[in-house]
Amino acid sequence: RVNSDLVGKVVNIASRCAGFIGKGFDGYLAEQPDNPELLAQIQSFKDEIGDLYESREYSKAIRLIMALADKANQYINDKEPWVIAKTDKQSPELQAICSSGINAFRLLMCYLKPVLPAMTASAEQFLAIEPLRWDDLDQLLVGHKINKFKPLMTRVEADKVQAMVDATQKEFEELAQTKAESPAPAAENTTGFEDEIEFDDFAKVDLRIAEIISAEHVEGADKLL
């Protein structure tokens, strides 16, 4: 299920649009996407998906991302860019439609980066962009030149994807544990008195009183009797 979602939904968005952009427009995206409403809808889930990652609900986050991918794929199905390309490979409409698809792909890959960093790195090379950051979800690629599309992945086993998710979750948990175990910095002493030990610690001290019965001079010593 995870495998078909990743390949058939997210990556397929790029593979369906990149060829038209490369052949008809020398790799350049349109200055204005065809469907800014769709892209705005994908962007609107930035906080919700971020919160799901923060609460370690990775499965819910991925399901939501895949639902957004469904919307992007449906948009491409409805617009049928391949039909437009048959009559005009340099149609501005074709460029705008495929630019919307590429931008949707970029946004979805940004959402997936916390759990699929290696795959996202390949997407970044294809998109010819700097490493994606969460704040990049607020921006779109316009008038930008992308590279030739190469298959980002041909097969991803569900257990491997789950292993990636588990590894990411483990890193979060280890970081949280480290923070929890780190001792809080000692409070600065502003009383003017030396620090005192707790009574419980004082009670553990073995104090004994001894009576000196006799004392004799120690030969060669100038400070001892």
Predicted regions, residues:
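Basic, alpha-helical terminal appendages of large translation-related enzymes
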Residues: 51, 56, 66, 70-225
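Long, charged, mostly alpha-helical binding arms that flank functional sites
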Residues: 1-96
